[in-house]
């Protein structure tokens, strides 16, 4: 993507963090976050549950330093990796941009019928 959104550190509380992530998942931009090693597992779990499971994710550690490390892929595989290899140091997380939603008029009519609007032309 050609757009970046820098979000910095998200809230440490799970509910607040999930709300922030839900809003960030609506963006069509790569999201850049900071995270502490102690909260990385919780952040990755929340990314997965708030719509980021299909997005590419990169966990970058100790950028510009001797022990620089980048792990990328689906969030599910990153969760498994960091469950076995605890993160250390300064962490930057990148979440790839979401795909533009594609639907046609029949999809919209079906959704409106489901919520009881009864839209018809």
Model regions and ranges:
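Class I SAM-dependent methyltransferase SAM-binding "motif I" and its flanking Rossmann-like core
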Residues: 1-27
């Amino acid at each position: 993507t050609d757009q970046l959104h820098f979000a910095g550190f998200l809230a440490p509380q799970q509910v607040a963090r999930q709300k922030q992530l839900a809003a960030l998942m609506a963006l069509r931009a790569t999201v850049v976050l900071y995270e502490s090693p102690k909260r990385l597992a919780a952040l990755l779990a929340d990314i997965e549950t708030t719509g980021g499971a299909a997005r590419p994710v990169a966990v970058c550690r100790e950028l510009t330093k001797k022990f620089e490390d980048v792990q990328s892929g689906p969030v599910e595989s990153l969760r498994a990796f960091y469950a076995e290899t605890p993160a250390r140091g300064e962490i930057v997380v990148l979440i790839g941009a979401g795909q533009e939603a594609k639907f046609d008029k029949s999809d919209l009519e079906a959704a409106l019928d489901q919520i009881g609007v009864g839209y018809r032309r």
